[in-house]
Amino acid sequence: MVFIAVFNGVFAMSSLPGTVLGIKAVNGVVIAGEKRLTYDGYVLSKNTRKVHPITKHVGIGFAGLVGDAQFIIRALRMEAENYELQLGREIRVRGLAKILSLILYSYKLAPLMTEVVVGGFDEKGPQIYVLDPVGSLIEDKYVALGSGGPIALGIIEKEYREDIDVDEAEKLAVSAIREAIERDAVSGDGVDVLRITEEGYSLREYMFRRETS
């Protein structure tokens, strides 16, 4: 996804750094992200987690600025906790995605520099949503965001099936991000995978390095 912003009447266009993706399976969802954090050509961290659970059954992944993403994570967790305290049940996947859409839109004049995947499982089954920095909300079967997103998306489109299960989706996610890492300099160092099914969520880590000749 390409991010377009307006500052003082001037359009700025760029891809946000990193690679994150989401895949909907028949029995759950997978959200995965690589681990590299860069700034101005420097690698600041090789162990940055870009996928996070918000509730037992909803999580997010982000590409872009970590500080903005951390603000979003805190805000969503607070909203989810308040929802559960007031109504006595966990917030639905689309409900949390719509809250995030409103948060992002409220900052449209000074956008939070993140692209976000929201995924989870509720009574409507597995769901994946994608949001841009100004709050556009789209549901899809799979998404790939950030500077490595186009590469990862090509792998997913080639291998995705309507009947894919969560184990196969995890393997596909890791494979797609590995390919993105090979071509995108600001992505690298491993993959974190957030799996969400009817039973809840689990986090897994895959470590690998960019191959050199």
UniProtKB/Swiss-Prot annotation:
Matches recorded under InterPro entries: Ntn_hydrolases_N (IPR029055), Pept_T1A_Psome_bsu_arc (IPR019983), Pept_T1A_subB (IPR000243), Proteasome_bsu_CS (IPR016050), Proteasome_sua/b (IPR001353), Proteasome_suB-type (IPR023333)
UniProt keyword annotation of Hydrolase present: yes
Sample GO molecular function, one term: threonine-type endopeptidase activity
Organism: Staphylothermus marinus (strain ATCC 43588 / DSM 3639 / JCM 9404 / F1)
One of the record's GO cellular component terms: cytoplasm
Alphabetical UniProt keywords: Autocatalytic cleavage, Cytoplasm, Hydrolase, Protease, Proteasome, Threonine protease, Zymogen
Propeptide: 1-18
EC code: 3.4.25.1
A GO BP annotation: proteasomal protein catabolic process
Catalyzed chemical reaction(s): Cleavage of peptide bonds with very broad specificity
Keyword Protease: yes
Domain of life: Archaea
UniProt-annotated catalytic positions: 19
Protein's name according to its UniProt entry: Proteasome subunit beta 1
Quaternary structure annotation from Swiss-Prot or TrEMBL: The 20S proteasome core is composed of 14 alpha and 14 beta subunits that assemble into four stacked heptameric rings, resulting in a barrel-shaped structure. The two inner rings, each composed of seven catalytic beta subunits, are sandwiched by two outer rings, each composed of seven alpha subunits. The catalytic chamber with the active sites is on the inside of the barrel. Has a gated structure, the ends of the cylinder being occluded by the N-termini of the alpha-subunits. Is capped at one or both ends by the proteasome regulatory ATPase, PAN.
Family to which the UniProt record says this protein belongs: Belongs to the peptidase T1B family.
Location within or outside the cell: Cytoplasm
Enzyme category, top tier: hydrolase
SUPFAM superfamilies named among the record's database cross-references: N-terminal nucleophile aminohydrolases (Ntn hydrolases)
Protein task: Component of the proteasome core, a large protease complex with broad specificity involved in protein degradation.
Activity regulation statement: The formation of the proteasomal ATPase PAN-20S proteasome complex, via the docking of the C-termini of PAN into the intersubunit pockets in the alpha-rings, triggers opening of the gate for substrate entry. Interconversion between the open-gate and close-gate conformations leads to a dynamic regulation of the 20S proteasome proteolysis activity.
